[in-house]
Amino acid sequence: MLAIICALALNRAIGYNNKLLYYLSADLKRFKSLTTGNTIIMGRRTFESLPKGALPNRRNIVLSRRKDAAFEGAEVFASLDEALAATKPGEDVFVLGGESVYAEAMSRADRLYLTHVEATPEAADAFFPEINEADWSLQHTERHDADEKNVVPFTFADYVRQGEKK
């Protein structure tokens, strides 16, 4: 299974200056629960934005066109095609971004695990690609109000590509 996981604002914004726009405790817990024990694929800048480097208990794959690229705790591939070819059939693989990696993976993904943040940031320079609603079937939603650990309301939304099994 190839899944995309992302938190996006009302205007599809996902980041600014190579940082997340919102730090939502429940979203981070969900992210950890879904990705732990699985393979994660991300672009170089996304990897470099991780405060502690490679995420533990996951196979970290970084996409970089630099032939000499090396990132501690991660495997490096030049393209999404090469990275996917290095995964096992039936393996759960999650794409973590950034913007261009999401755009490339969108046509191949089987599932979307999205957090729809009910806010629009003042500034953003990275955006999630348009979602063609006809391609996706909404399987589950879970709304969360803002609270002391989550500064804005948001909704978890899980989608399966039309024609795929649940």
Label each residue range with its predicted role.
Residues I5-T39, R44-K166:
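Flexible, gly/pro- and Lys/Arg-enriched active-site loops
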